[in-house]
A protein has these predicted regions:
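ATP-binding N-lobe of GHMP and related small-molecule kinases
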Residues: 1-76, 90, 94, 98-100, ...
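Short beta-strand-to-loop capping motifs
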Residues: 33, 154, 243-247
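Short, conserved charged micro-motifs
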Residues: 36-40, 160, 248-254
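DPxDG-like acidic metal-binding loop motif
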Residues: 78-101, 123-128
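Alpha/beta catalytic cores of group-transfer enzymes, especially the acyltransferase/condensing modules
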Residues: 102-146, 232
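Active-site rim beta-loop-alpha module in soluble metabolic enzymes
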Residues: 151-212
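Glycine-rich, charge-dense phosphate/pyrophosphate-binding loop(s)
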Residues: 190-281
Length: 281
């Protein structure tokens, strides 16, 4: 069985741990039954997820050979772990013939990942906002075609644990209120294609001020985006950066060429995936 899952960009600035979107950048996972599994195979996130599914449903997990055709860069803030989890759950649900409802699979994915901002958009496609503290509640929307997206992928990795450790444990009430308001506005701006609303709602107080120091060239790249009337966010935990522009903005197409940066950055133009994960065959 082959399962295809899109990469994602989470947070979108103020939407920390609750908002994300999917792109047409895919990992394809190949699942085959086998008689022998190495210890390395047993410890993979994909197989651990399959085991989780079978244990939750009082079944014994099959032995599997799992290979990946990977196009989503690892440890770059693009939801590579979410692709592993979603692929394994889709496989297990189909292979076991249990055919559990989508809501249950999404709850499993969030329990395994610990937060919904990558696993939900990877599974569902589009733009997703979700809450998990009192049961999983989410809303999916399609992103306006008035935007275009440039992903800046660095030549250095960012460990999620390190990025999470950088975030402060306490925040001022004013900053919390600002983030709540702006995350709502960003979701709406992405739906209706309002670039002005997006730009005016992009400031985050929870994670970007603390994570940006871990990303070389951040301030320079942010300034380039601002000068070209675009918005730049740290994608997930980093190190990748997501630039959102008006679809008619021609200047942004070459704005990140020939950069005199410390790190090497690759600019990739991406389209939104509105369909999410699915079984190829």
């Amino acid at each position: 069985m082959i399962v295809r899952v899109p990469g994602t960009s989470a947070n979108l600035g103020p939407g920390y741990d609750c908002m994300g979107m999917a792109f047409k950048l895919y990992n394809d996972f190949h699942f085959e039954e086998t008689d022998f599994m190495s210890e390395e195979d047993k410890e993979s996130l994909m197989y651990k997820t399959v085991e989780f599914f079978y244990k939750e449903n009082n079944l014994e997990a099959p032995k599997l050979k799992i290979t990946v055709d990977a196009n989503v860069p690892m440890t770059r803030g693009l939801g590579s772990s979410a692709t592993c989890i979603d692929a394994a759950l889709l496989f297990a649900n189909e292979f076991s013939n249990l055919n559990l409802e989508k809501q249950k699979l999404l709850e499993y994915a969030t329990r395994i990942e610990g937060h919904p901002d990558n696993v939900l958009p990877a599974f569902l496609g589009g733009l997703v906002c979700a809450s998990y503290d009192d049961g999983l509640v989410y809303y999916k929307a399609e992103v306006s075609e008035k935007f275009k997206f440039t992903l800046l992928v660095a030549d250095f990795a960012m460990e999620t644990k390190l990025a999470r450790k950088a975030v402060k444990d306490t925040l001022s009430l004013d900053h919390v209120i600002s983030n709540i308001a702006k995350s709502n506005l960003i979701f709406q701006a992405m739906r209706i294609g309002d670039m002005d609303m997006l730009r005016r709602s992009a400031k985050d107080y929870i994670h970007e001020p603390y994570r940006k120091v871990l990303i070389e060239d951040y301030d320079m790249l942010k300034e380039i985006a601002n000068k070209n009337e675009s918005v730049l966010f740290i994608s997930g935990a980093g190190s990748s950066l997501l630039v959102i522009s008006d679809s008619n903005n021609k200047n942004i197409d070459t704005a990140f060429d020939n950069l005199g940066t410390k790190a090497k950055w690759k600019a990739i133009n991406l389209e939104v995936d509105n369909d999410g994960a699915y079984i190829l065959r």
